[in-house]
A protein has these predicted regions:
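N-terminal secretory signal peptides and thylakoid transit peptides that target proteins
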Residues: 8-30
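N-terminal Rossmann-like dinucleotide-binding module
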Residues: 25, 29-94, 255
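Predominantly a Rossmann-like dinucleotide-binding segment in NAD(P)-dependent oxidoreductases
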Residues: 56, 167-173, 178-278, 286-288, ...
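Glycine- and charged-residue-rich phosphate/anionic-cofactor binding loop of Rossmann-like
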Residues: 74-76, 337-343, 360-376
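A structured beta-alpha segment of the ubiquitous adenosine-cofactor-binding alpha/beta core
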Residues: 99-117, 121
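Beta-strand-loop-alpha-helix segment that lines the small-molecule cofactor/substrate pocket
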Residues: 129-180, 194
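C-terminal capping/lid region of NAD(P)-dependent oxidoreductase domains
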Residues: 171, 197-203, 387-404, 409-415
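NAD(P)-dinucleotide binding in Rossmann-like oxidoreductases
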Residues: 276, 289-352
């Protein structure tokens, strides 16, 4: 399932995020606040906290803002969300001055007109490229939620914003939790060093129950109301990118990370087996062909109950790497790696990314290495989605040349 914060979750890990579990899971992580170089922060003095503007104040935005505050090196000073109730609830929780709470589709621009050192972007994915580009243009460091975009033009935009950020000596970090995990990192390093031999094929799955329960209720109340549709963005194909991009990207990202490649082409299918609201599908099946004729089968569903898992496996001539979002990460074969269990990955990964963002800003590191692989994984989901929608084989080059743009229905929403 997916909780209202966008957390990828299964029956095994529902309800795990609470204060006690979070503190226990992250107690080994400690940060010492370094002296902040004055030139890296605008309108602040050395040793002061990084001034954050939050764009997107829903459940996930509020949750991750709390992690930024707990880090100790940040202060939330401004907030923007389309909805007044959300930005006010957020502002009260984090003591954001009422004059620095902005609403409407263009509220983020007013936020950036003020003095913020960095922006955290947690709104519907359709808006991510626009918000990220505006942040970089305004001279702010950018912390961007996945997925980075819903379509090819959006991915190109974020890729360009990442390059522009580096040129302007700004940090730009994409918040994929899996890539921060020590077990995942060690397993991927071993595979790329040849521990399972030549990879022949693989599989990636995202099998969960139905999510977005609150959004379903919102949309069911009045499906034609534009503000209801915006609140229920996870059920809207253009606002979310559909489940293969918005949710399933967690599994796809691990596959592209292990193979360190983009697919050549893909064949797919899927549909709506249970959903009755919105226009997103609830299941996808895709066969990706990567360089060297490596075949990776992908399957996802967000419906029903029963067995569920978020995993990626790669099969080599000398072994198998097996990774699970909430379970075992290991290698079996001639050169085994016992690995272990990826613990509380959703929270711990975000905490590590928040720490990395702070350390990169304060140390003046602007390589922004998370952007290119995030673009690659996002485009890989779009390739699978395109192939599934058209029920045929689609090449990477064909997808990029088509440059298809998703356009949501924003009529009736306030600017």
């Amino acid at each position: 399932m997916t909780d209202e914060a966008g957390k990828p979750s299964t029956n095994r890990d529902r309800g795990q995020i609470n204060r006690r579990h979070f503190l226990a899971g992250t107690g080994a992580l400690a940060w010492s606040l370094t002296v902040v170089k004055p030139e890296l922060l605008r309108g602040t003095q050395a040793n002061s906290r990084i001034a954050l503007g939050m764009i997107g104040c829903g459940v996930r935005g509020t949750w991750i803002a709390d992690l930024f505050v707990k880090h100790g090196g940040y202060e939330v000073v401004a907030a923007a969300d389309y909805f007044q109730d959300r930005v006010d609830a957020f502002g009260e929780k984090f003591r954001v001055d009422s004059a620095r709470r902005y609403t409407g589709l263009s509220g983020y621009r007013k936020l950036l007109d003020g003095k913020v050192d960095a922006v955290v972007i947690e709104g519907p994915p359709y808006f991510h490229p626009e918000h990220a580009a505006a942040g970089v243009d305004a001279g702010a460091h950018v912390f961007l939620a996945k997925p980075i975009a819903v379509d090819v033009p959006g991915c190109r935009s974020v890729e360009a914003s990442g390059r522009q950020a580096s040129a302007k000596k700004l940090c730009f970090l994409v918040d994929f939790q899996t890539r921060t995990d020590p077990l995942y990192r060690e397993a991927v390093k071993r595979v790329q060093n040849g521990d399972i031999g030549r990879i022949i094929c693989g599989e990636a799955t995202y099998i969960t129950g139905e999510g977005f329960g609150r959004q379903v209720s919102d949309l069911r109340a009045d499906p034609t109301n534009p503000e209801r549709r915006l609140r229920a963005w996870g059920l809207d194909r253009a606002l979310s990118g559909d489940v293969i991009t918005e949710q399933n990207i967690h599994a796809v990202d691990v596959a592209t990370w292990i193979l360190d490649a983009q697919p050549v082409h893909a064949y797919g299918d899927g549909g709506r087996g249970a959903r009755t609201l919105g226009d997103c599908w609830d299941h996808f099946s895709v066969i990706y062909t990567f360089p060297g004729d490596v075949l990776v089968t992908f399957c996802s569903k967000q419906l029903g109950e029963g067995w569920d898992d978020i995993l990626c496996r790669m099969y080599g001539v000398e072994g198998t790497v097996d990774t699970h979002y909430s379970e075992d990460v290991s290698i079996r074969g001639k050169t085994p790696f016992a690995g272990g269990k990826a613990t509380n990955l959703y929270a711990n990964g975000a905490v590590r990314n928040i720490a990395d963002f702070y350390n990169n800003i304060t140390a003046g590191r602007f390589a922004n290495e998370t952007v290119p692989p995030s673009v690659r994984s996002n485009l890989t989901t779009i390739l699978g989605r395109t192939a599934a929608y058209h029920h045929r084989d689609v090449t990477w080059d064909e997808m990029m040349k088509a440059d298809e743009r998703l356009v949501p229905k924003l009529e009736g929403l306030k600017a």
